[in-house]
Amino acid sequence: MSSLVKEDLEKKLFKPLAQNLCEFIEIEVSVQDRYFLCVSVTKTDEVKITMVKHYRVGLDEKYEVTKRWSLSDLRMIDGKEADTDNPFFDLHFKKVYSLEAYSCASKYSFARTVSRLNHVYLKKDLHMVNFDSTYINDDSIWSSNNKDCLVLMRICFYAFNLVCLSLCPLPL
C-alpha cells in the first residue's frame, strides 16, 4: 500500500517539481484528512521537507502541499521521549511544529532519513534529541536498509531475552 502511495506522490507532486521523493510518513493532523510528511531532494541537491494533504475528488487522488521547509532551516528534531514508544515529535524551524507520526517506527524512519540526507548534502550539525541513537545512527549494529524491520527485530530480541530470564529458576 505504501509503495503505491509513494509512486502516486512522486508522479503527481514531486516529479513535476523535478524532485526525488526519498521518504514519506503518514502523520496525524486531523481525523477526517490524511497527511504525509515527505522528504525530497531537488535537482540542485537541496533537501526539502514537505507536509502534504491527501484528499479525493470522486475517484481521483489529489495531493496539496500545505507546508514546505528546507532542511537547512531545520534546527532540531525532538523525539519527545527516547525511552517510551510514542509517535510524537517536534520539528524546530523558526517555529516549532508538533507532529504525531502514524507509529513510533515511522517517526524513527523519518528521523533516519533526515539524518542521512543531512550528512550527505548539508553536513551541518543537526540536533536530534530524545531519540534512541541506536536506531538513528548508521554506525550501529542494528542499522541497515531494512529500516523499520530492525526496530521490530530488536524489540523481539529483548522480548525473547525477557522470556528466557523469566523461565530460569531462581536459586534459593
Swiss-Prot record:
It holds the Pfam family Sec3-PIP2_bind. This is Exocyst complex component 1-like. It comes from Mus musculus (Mouse).
